[in-house]
Amino acid sequence: MGSEVNRPLADFPANIWEDPLTSFSKSDLGTETFKEKHSTLKEAVKEAFMSSKANPIENIKFIDALCRLGVSYHFEKDIVEQLDKSFDCLDFPQMVRQEGCDLYTVGIIFQVFRQFGFKLSADVFEKFKDENGKFKGHLVTDAYGMLSLYEAAQWGTHGEDIIDEALAFSRSHLEEISSRSSPHLAIRIKNALKHPYHKGISRIETRQYISYYEEEESCDPTLLEFAKIDFNLLQILHREELACVTRWHHEMEFKSKVTYTRHRITEAYLWSLGTYFEPQYSQARVITTMALILFTALDDMYDAYGTMEELELFTDAMDEWLPVVPDEIPIPDSMKFIYNVTVEFYDKLDEELEKEGRSGCGFHLKKSLQKTANGYMQEAKWLKKDYIATFDEYKENAILSSGYYALIAMTFVRMTDVAKLDAFEWLSSHPKIRVASEIISRFTDDISSYEFEHKREHVATGIDCYMQQFGVSKERAVEVMGNIVSDAWKDLNQELMRPHVFPFPLLMRVLNLSRVIDVFYRYQDAYTNPKLLKEHIVSLLIETIPI
C-alpha cells in the first residue's frame, strides 16, 4: 500500500553516528583512584568555599566559578543558603556602589543572584552611566567588564530598560574588543556572542570554561583539577546511558521499521543531557531520550509521511488511547509500530508512577502527548487545504505543535521527590514559564528551518503567516518573531525569580529545555543537520579532559 501512495517525504540528512555503542567507547577513568582523588578534592574545594564567606564579594565570585566549572551541584544547598543569607542581610546595591567594585564584579554579582532566583535590582548598573544617561565610554577598554555586562544582561526581565541598554551597548563593542584580547579571552568572547552562558547548554559551557579557566592567572589549581575529574567521571556515566538507549533502539528494530524518520539517538541524548547532567538524574536522561526518539518519529510521520486519511485515523486512535492499533485500521505498518511503541512506553510509565504513589500523573503525561498530536494534526489539515493561518491562529497551535508541553512533562517523570500530581496539574494549566518555553521552541525553530522546509510541500510557518497577514517582507517577519522570542526569554527569566510557585528544580527543567533550543536552533536546525552538533558531541562524550 505505502509504495502506491504519494507521500510528502523529506530529504533528511543521514545519521552520522552509525553505531553509538562502538563510537563512544568506555574510558578507564572510572577507577577507585580517580574517585578517591575526586572525594579528597571535593573536601578541599568545599573548605575553600566556606572560607570565602568572610568576603561576600569574593564568595560570589567563587560561586560563579563553581557554576561555570560545572561542579556547583555538589554544594548546591550550601550555595543557596549562603546567597539567601547574603541577599537578606547585606546591602549589595549599596556595596556595589563602592569605588572598588568594577563592572566585571558587578556583572558577576548580578548574574549569580539572578541565576539562583534572587532578583537583584538592575539599578546596580547605574553607577556606570554618565550624566547623559549613557554607559561611560571608557568601559569599552575593560574587556572582562564588558563581557561580564553582556552576560549579566541576558537575565533581563520586562521593564528593565537599563538591562536592554546594557545588552545593546556590550554587544555592539565585544566583537571589536575580542580582536585586541588575548587568544583565550578572544575565544571566550566569541563563544559568548554565539551562545551566551545563560542560554547555553550547561555541559558545553563547562567544557569550554575549563579550557579557558586553565589559562587564567586567577586559576585555582585544586578547583581546576576537581572540575576536570568530575567532568570525566560524569562522562563515563553519560556514555553508559547513551549505550542503554542505543540498545533499546536496536532491540526495537526502530531503524528498519521506520525508515523515513530522522534517526538521532546521539543528538536526542544531547538534548536530554542539556536538560539535566547531574548524576542523580541518570534514569531521567534515559527516559527523556527515549521519549525524544518517539517524538521525532511522530513529528516526521505527521510532517513527512502520513496521508491526511492515515493521520486522522492515527490521531483518533491516540485520542481514544487504544492499547494497540487494530489490524482493520488501514494505516501503514510503520505508523502502527510508532503508535504501539509509544502507547506501550507511556502505559509502562503510568504503571510505574502509580506504584510510586503518584497516581494521576500518568493521565497528565498522556494528555500532553495527545495535545501535541492534535497540534500536528491541525498543521496537516492546514497543509491539505493549502490554508495560511492568521498569525494568532498559528501561534495558538504552535504552542502545542512545539511538543514542549509533552517534553517538559516527560522531564518531570523521574523527578520523584518534587514532581507530584500538583506539579503535573500546574504544568497543564498553561503557566507563563511553560508558554514562554513553547514560544522559544516553536519560533526559534521556524526561523532556523525556514529555508529547508520551503524546499518541499510544508505547512505555512509562523514567518509565512505573519507575512501574509501583515503584508511585510520575510526579513521583517523574522525580526518580529525574533522580538517575540526575546520577550519570551524575559517572561522565562521573571518566572525564575523568587518566590517560586513550585520547586526550583522543576523550573530549571523548563529553562534548560529552552537553552537546548537556543543551541540547537538559533542559527540552523542542528537536530536535522547533525554535523552541526558533532563538535559538541565529541567534546562531551568522546574526548576526556587530560588531567
UniProtKB/Swiss-Prot annotation:
EC number: 4.2.3.-, 4.2.3.57, 4.2.3.133, 4.2.3.104
Alphabetized UniProt keyword annotations: Cytoplasm, Lyase, Magnesium, Manganese, Metal-binding
Binding site for Mg(2+) 2: D299, D303
GO cellular component: cytoplasm
Pfam families, sorted: Terpene_synth, Terpene_synth_C
Molecular-function GO term, any one: alpha-humulene synthase activity
Binding site residues for (2E,6E)-farnesyl diphosphate: R262, D299, D303, R442, D445
Compartments where found: Cytoplasm
Recorded catalytic activity of this chain's protein: (2E,6E)-farnesyl diphosphate = (-)-(E)-beta-caryophyllene + diphosphate; (2E,6E)-farnesyl diphosphate = alpha-copaene + diphosphate; (2E,6E)-farnesyl diphosphate = alpha-humulene + diphosphate; (2E,6E)-farnesyl diphosphate = (1S,2S,4R)-beta-elemene + diphosphate
Induction text: Induced in response to the caterpillar P.xylostella feeding.
Disruption phenotype: Does not emit (E)-beta-caryophyllene, alpha-copaene and alpha-humulene.
Cofactor note: Binds 3 Mg(2+) or Mn(2+) ions per subunit.
Domain of life where this protein originates: Eukaryota
EC main group: lyase
Motif (DDXXD motif): 299-303
Keyword Lyase part of the UniProt annotation: yes
Binding site for Mg(2+) 1: D299, D303
Pathway noted in the entry: Secondary metabolite biosynthesis; terpenoid biosynthesis
Chain positions recorded as Mg(2+) 3 binding sites: D445, D446, S449, E453
Assembly notes: Monomer.
Function field: Involved in sesquiterpene (C15) biosynthesis. The major products are beta-caryophyllene and alpha-humulene. Does not convert geranyl diphosphate (GPP) to any monoterpenes.
Protein family: Belongs to the terpene synthase family. Tpsa subfamily.
Entry domain remark: The Asp-Asp-Xaa-Xaa-Asp/Glu (DDXXD/E) motif is important for the catalytic activity, presumably through binding to Mg(2+).
Name of this protein: Alpha-humulene/(-)-(E)-beta-caryophyllene synthase
Organism: Arabidopsis thaliana (Mouse-ear cress)
Lineage, highest ranks first: Eukaryota, Viridiplantae, Streptophyta, Embryophyta, Tracheophyta
